[in-house]
């Protein structure tokens, strides 16, 4: 490895231990643009009795479907249509809608609301079923209900589970204040899980979606914590000598892989989700970092410079004592930040290309790898729970922003709209239990 390459990789490792630059408060609005000719035309009528609600459910549904890039919203007019009404399939088809949604909202005796809807296929002229959902009469409850309806529509019409009712985590810096934010999948309803005057990096969702592991510098060094979202309780997972970084959950949620400089060069260890049972997994004289479990729990992918330059390797989840690490990436001379798709078929990573850093996706069966972005300062990729999209951090207009792109590269990436701010370290949460 040349001195420049070695210094570059060490700078990369160091950059994992510093936070984003200053910015004003950021509001994320997630938008993923699809290919118009492949978008599914659908009409979602206003639901009966929803006009008086704090948040209209159908506005959330329409926004979700449009944001996915897979649907085109056909104007359904302003007249509410209940799910009990007879459907004139020909009329809706004439409007250009291949599917139609009707529904209603009713108040329950306990003050909650029941939302009923039915999805129709106007081409085959048949019902595709629906749901009856109970929700609280507040903005959060109505938003969640809208996301659930959009998920139902997405799965019924496209055959893939939707990810609208999932959450994002990311880090925002305002001046010298850092916030770990948890938001809906559309970037709305963001709430701080942690606010600190010291950097916060590397948030990672637990498989249950109830916990987030992250690295905080509040003790004047990088320490790995777990934050229990329902209770707000948090606790230390790794505070070993040196740097503690890059937490990654095992699929069963019982173990985390972490990168520690306990003995000098950064190596990969495992630790239980309670912070006990520290076990070393790699034993090289190089830098081993950024671990990530395969969905079946059999492998850990990681970044290492053991071959002379940063590349992605994989080893048995039990460590190199259970089997030698094998190199995975061969396209390009500098590859980092491995993330595996939920079905285990794709590897997303960051590759240095032409002086910049681009998000690549590799087919793990064929080894074919392709850039899926046109940005040049990409970092921190994170797959959606259905594997259809990748969220990542990049630079745009001199600001640190988030972007999303279809994992198959079928459409260009979309920079997320922010209002005066820099945000980094994205992590897309799992399906909600």
Swiss-Prot record:
Protein name (record): Tol-Pal system protein TolB
Pfam families: PD40 (PF07676), TolB_N (PF04052)
Protein keywords: Cell cycle, Cell division, Periplasm, Signal
Job of this protein: Part of the Tol-Pal system, which plays a role in outer membrane invagination during cell division and is important for maintaining outer membrane integrity.
Keyword Signal: yes
CC terms in the record's Gene Ontology section: periplasmic space
Family the entry assigns: Belongs to the TolB family.
Location (main, coarse): periplasm
